[in-house]
């Protein structure tokens, strides 16, 4: 590993350690339109308390999911066959598509979605919408 990479890793670790010390809320539910929430949980050393990990929704679908949150979360996700993607895609309430881009199979994605969905604390939520890459399609 080169010196630049070592310095960046050192600084990253120091910043994360300082942020963990300053953290007052150890159980947030982060609802993010892309992978950002997973990074935040990881950097702070927190348990994933949200199903919105390793996936993305388009900004339009993300807003629709938030506007109808209970219905969206409580409706089973169905697999989209022949999505044209090389990763699993699901569709939930109101036709909202979920792109499970960091999962190998739909079964794995749904298992994690349902497991983490049980940890949601609706009284301790933070929401983050990203329009990175023109549609939230990159993590």
PLM regions and their residue ranges:
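Extracellular glycan-modifying ectodomains
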Residues: 2-139
């Amino acid at each position: 590993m080169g010196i630049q990479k070592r310095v960046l890793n050192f600084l990253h670790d120091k910043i994360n350690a300082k942020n963990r010390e300053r953290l007052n809320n150890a159980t947030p539910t982060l609802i993010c339109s892309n992978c950002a929430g997973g990074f935040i949980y990881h950097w702070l050393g927190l348990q994933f308390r949200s199903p919105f990990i390793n996936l993305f929704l388009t900004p339009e679908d993300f807003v629709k999911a938030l506007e109808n949150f209970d219905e969206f979360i409580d409706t089973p996700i169905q697999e989209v066959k022949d999505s044209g993607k090389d990763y699993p895609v699901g569709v939930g309430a109101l036709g909202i598509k979920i792109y499970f881009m960091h999962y190998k199979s739909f079964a794995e994605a749904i298992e994690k979605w349902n497991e983490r969905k049980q940890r949601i604390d609706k009284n301790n939520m933070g929401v983050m919408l990203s329009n990175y890459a023109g549609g939230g399609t990159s993590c």
